[in-house]
């Protein structure tokens, strides 16, 4: 049986919010079977819990923000991407502020935290959402689509008319049966344009952004001394974001996601569209791990 997974131990980290610039304390805790991923604002009294579900997404400007009764938790996508990539079904995420810390701008530090905490299998079957037919949403020239696929695959293309990005691969196809999320995707950092950063700061956004957590690009070049981690780090980061956004379905996916210039808003619109079309998907479990189109590393090795 492919089993549900949680963490073995509690683990903590500290960082800053990308947009708020505030110091944030993050704690990841094991959670019982069928809990899902639940974010908790421990700085509030009483503590506010917000399940990481598509219907709880309230804002998608520059990051994915969960909202419940006016309480917000911003920038959840990189942590969710790490949880999805390692197949963690159940986890409590405690935060001391309204934003998940940005760490280095990728999902890498969260992968490290989860692996350091250890992964525990639970005595219940892991539930997958299997795509049964195509579902598409569009917004002008942006597009996001689910199609049936026996496994998990992400196809993504971006279209930036910028000398730095134009000269690199702007399209990628990643089949996770043969490609490691941890090695090939998790370390891709968020990127921003120098000309936009001033505007964002004027709006009280990107206050925690720096060369330590963003690939900064001016009109001609990458400003970070160490350059890029992957040749196609820009489009790979969009894949990382999409995997985090898709995990708001609450389960791992069996299917293919295709995105063209899609961002957090369109990704969420696609999830809501899929969930509303009950004949387009089904929940499946696997008694025999050998029959599953998706496999996960054994926890000892993960």
Curated annotation (Swiss-Prot):
Q: Identify the domain of life.
A: Bacteria
Q: Which GO terms describe its cellular component?
A: membrane
Under the heading Gene3D superfamilies, the entry gives:
lpxc deacetylase, domain 1, lpxc deacetylase, domain 2
Q: What cofactor does its activity depend on?
A: Zn(2+)
What InterPro entries does this protein map onto? Ribosomal_Su5_D2-typ_SF (IPR020568), UDP-acyl_GlcNac_deAcase (IPR004463), UDP-acyl_GlcNac_deAcase_C (IPR011334), UDP-acyl_N-AcGlcN_deAcase_N (IPR015870)
E.C. numbers: 3.5.1.108
Primary enzyme class: hydrolase
Its annotated pathway reads: Glycolipid biosynthesis; lipid IV(A) biosynthesis; lipid IV(A) from (3R)-3-hydroxytetradecanoyl-[acyl-carrier-protein] and UDP-N-acetyl-alpha-D-glucosamine: step 2/6
| Catalysed reaction equations from the record | a UDP-3-O-[(3R)-3-hydroxyacyl]-N-acetyl-alpha-D-glucosamine + H2O = a UDP-3-O-[(3R)-3-hydroxyacyl]-alpha-D-glucosamine + acetate
Keyword list (alphabetical) reads:
Hydrolase, Lipid A biosynthesis, Lipid biosynthesis, Lipid metabolism, Metal-binding, Zinc
Recorded GO terms, molecular function? Answer: metal ion binding; UDP-3-O-acyl-N-acetylglucosamine deacetylase activity
Q: Enumerate the active-site residues.
A: 264 (proton donor)
Q: Report residues binding Zn(2+).
A: 78, 237, 241
Q: Tell me one GO biological process term.
A: lipid A biosynthetic process
A Pfam family this chain is assigned to: LpxC
Q: PANTHER family from the xrefs?
A: UDP-3-O-ACYL-N-ACETYLGLUCOSAMINE DEACETYLASE 1, MITOCHONDRIAL-RELATED
Protein family (similarity comment): Belongs to the LpxC family.
Role according to the record: Catalyzes the hydrolysis of UDP-3-O-myristoyl-N-acetylglucosamine to form UDP-3-O-myristoylglucosamine and acetate, the committed step in lipid A biosynthesis.
| Protein name per the record | UDP-3-O-acyl-N-acetylglucosamine deacetylase
